[in-house]
Amino acid sequence: MTVKVRFDKEVREYAKGEKVKDSVLKITETALAQALEKFHRRMIVIEGDTLKKAELAGILAGASARVLSDIVGELIEKRLRDESEDKIEVLYATDALGEETFGRKRYEAFRKHFDVLAGSEVNVTAVTFKHTREILGRTYDLLILDMSYDYSPNDLGRIIETVRGGGLIFILAHPFEKWKDMWTGFHKSLVTPPYTIEDVKKRFNRRLIRKFTQHDGIYIITESGKAKKKPKKSKSQAKIRARKGVEIPEETLFPKELYEMALTRGQVEVLKAFEELVDKEGMLVLTADRGRGKSVSVGIAAIGLAVALKKRTRIVVTAPELENVQSLFRFAKRALEKLGFKPYVVEEKGLIKELYARKIGLRYYPPAEGYKKNADLYILDEAAGIHVPILHKYLNKPRVVYSSTIHGYEGAGRGFSVKFLKKAREKRSFKELHMEEPIRYAYGDPIEKWLFDVLLLDAEPVELTEEDYELIKRKEVYLEEPDLDDWFENDREDLRHFVGIYILAHYRNRPSDVALLADAPHHEARVLRLKNGKIVTAVQIAKEGGIPKNVIDKMAKGYKPRGNIIPDMMVKHHYLKEFARLKGYRIVRIATHPDAMDMGLGSKALELLEKEAREKGLDWIGSGFGASEELVRFWVRNGFAVVHLSPARNPVSGEFTAIVLKPISKKAKELIKKANDEFRIRFTEWLGDTHRELEPEIARWLFETPFGEAVDYPIHLTEIQKKRLDAFTGKVLTYDTVVDAVKPIVKLYFLDGWMKPYLDERQIKLLIYRVLQAHSWEETAKLIDRTEMFTMIEVRDIIRGLWYYYKRLLT
């Protein structure tokens, strides 16, 4: 079917009255015709520094909405949009919509012309970047993205991907020559003492501008109508091809109405895979690029399963954030309505959190909570954004579905496959499905290519050869500070390799991480290169400290400066104001090439970074991270002292955050030892309260110290307590009657230096779990896989040895 994509006489006369050149209308017509014919998106960037650019966007978007409204019926008939989507949806996103703000003025200038031309069959949604959560899971035909003052790369990824094939994106931008030297609101958020806005770089803006000019499908005009980048030839009609028909299986367990909602073969396969979970328990792993309808399919299939089970069905839905599952919930709701249900929806801040209909219930829980709930089905959406230990908590569930984006603004990458699926295969068999056919837009969409390129969403590390592994074994590596100007300005492959290591090795990456590296004055990169130049370890550091006295005094009273995470913690939690004057490197992220893990490269990078810091006259190096056993052990074994542990677990990773420090200067050593001693004292008490559920194998490493000395902390026992300890170790009294006397002895052990009685791993875990965390004998016996009687005897034997050793110190 061929449709005419030409603005009518009324539009042309209106545009002429507003002094809009006919050539600009033709660029817009051509862009829309191309988008409709290819089922791709197209972008028009409007440069300018007055309200004219918003007015021009209003005219061009209004004219486009008018054309789309005329053909919406044909688009539904061709299965390019759902029958419920019978109105043209327009999204306007800007930094501010409050009265008297420039963002509001631009929006009003846009609406002044848009409302005249667009017609009544159009819905307009206006949001600020702070509220883009509300649009997730929705799809739009036209987007006006006001980037005149502020935006963050996260906003860019999130918003652009809501536009469907056949749609247009209008970018309101400053003149490029001016924009490349401008500071945005995002830049202001990067200022941290002792730096000023003058120190903030503009590398990311320049990269963005360059990518506008390099990629196909993007046209650039000025607010006065000058075309700086236009289509090679004009186009005023589009041949619209129907989406390929989907073959519905003759025999299905799920209602046919649900299969009729499927737009691609991939979605049908998801429904069939869910059918296999009706009669038997099982696990399904579903992966896809963005825009493939993955979450939509899971939402529909979950309802199919609930109906087919013919019983009260509870479904736990989890994802890194509630915003990640909005498509899933919306289509689950639509599926229920298709089947004649009247679903009840519970929302939180405009986002669906719970969905109920008769005997069916879907509810969202944070990843660290969901596995504790009883349910018939567990769905983990955007699973690559959930920390691996939490993913494993769901592995033994009877029916579980892991669903994940391989690329996209969540920044998942192949890390999900590398870090989780490999180990999951050893524990359980499961079915894997990969969805390839796009739903929101067709293959080869130029805007997707542009987005992936500008935000480095598909970056991957360099390939390693056998020769490379030999170099790694011999540690023929060197640490280098790359020239970030060169990386970003000249689009070096090294930048992609650097970011690619993080995408594969880290559980969560966001586009703003790249902009932070590009522009933050206190952030720098270091790379560990092989002799042949290949990057095998990526390190991102933040320079912290050197804070003026007046700011330190404010910090002590509660002020929290941006950045300076470690100095702020040392001032607030350890009252060591002088630490904030010292300078150091906070290691923001350190990751090794996934094919070169456990080969000592991370430790080598730390060794060389410490050497560099020493040569530069810095006082310390440190880091903050999710406290897993593996990571705490890594940092402690590299000579770092633990100085803080957060009181609550991260809701996504399920981990407490630890902060570690390694002194370089004499003054830093004195202060860090004080903080480490204080932390160890506090930790003996926290384990019975805020950290009672902390895994003992992690706790044992948090007690380790690089200083080798006992904490100067007086332990006092009365003469009666000493006699009762003698009676307990002599099998006269039971443990429960002498806890008050046992606990100080165990504290003494954990606060001691290196010259203390030897205990093996199991014995250390027993003391932490039973004595400091006060778990029951039953729970403690389960921990070491022994009987309660054996556990009681072992604890008595350990205490006997400790009491014999420390008795002489307490006389």
From Swiss-Prot:
Name it: tRNA(Met) cytidine acetyltransferase TmcA
Tell me, what is an example of a GO biological process annotation in this record?
tRNA wobble cytosine modification
Where does the chain bind acetyl-CoA?
590-592, 630, 637
Instruction: Kindly list the places in or outside the cell where this protein is found, as annotated in its UniProt entry.
Output: Cytoplasm
Describe the inactivation phenotype.
Answer: Grows at 85 but not 93 degrees Celsius, loss of N(4)-acetylcytidine (ac(4)C) residues in tRNA, no change in thermostabiity of bulk tRNA. Complete loss of all ac(4)C in rRNA, tRNA, ncRNA and mRNA, decreased growth rate starting from 75 degrees Celsius, very slow to no growth at 95 degrees Celsius.
Q: Which family does it belong to?
A: Belongs to the TmcA family.
**Which InterPro entries does this entry report, sorted A to Z?**
Acyl_CoA_acyltransferase (IPR016181), GNAT_dom (IPR000182), NAT10/TcmA_helicase (IPR007807), P-loop_NTPase (IPR027417), TmcA/NAT10/Kre33 (IPR032672), TmcA_N (IPR013562), tRNA_acetyltr_TmcA (IPR024914)
Its EC number(s)? 2.3.1.193
GO CC annotation, single: cytoplasm
Kindly list the positions annotated as binding ATP: 267, 440
- Residues forming the N-acetyltransferase domain are 474-663
* Species: Thermococcus kodakarensis (strain ATCC BAA-918 / JCM 12380 / KOD1) (Pyrococcus kodakaraensis (strain KOD1))
* UniProt xrefs under PROSITE patterns: GNAT
